[in-house]
Amino acid sequence: MTNDFKKLENSIVGCKKCTRLVRFRNKIAKDKRKQYINQKYWGKPITGFGDPKARILFVGLAPAAHGGNRTGRVFTGDRSSDFLYKCLYKANLSNQPNSDHRNDAVSYTHLTLPTTPYV
């Protein structure tokens, strides 16, 4: 990751400008779903992930409350990511058919999944 991307990532993760969104993500991180009750939620803004020189940019609408807000990575740990990663793997764009948490070993070829501040 380049220094510019690292600076942008740090800026995004530390952002608290939209108080409504801060309250919402903090509430979700505190009032967990029963199935994730023993997991620690990320509860901060999430950043993009992937190859900064990618030819394919896949942009989602918003981080999932119990997916990205829980795992700390866009399109990770929820039902939409289960489907997405199977497709990416089948298309040879991902090295594995699933992504369950921020520090798993998933990587992309020619693909990045940004959040809107990157776009």
What do these predicted ranges mean?
Residues T2-L113, P117:
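A polyanion-binding, active-site-adjacent surface
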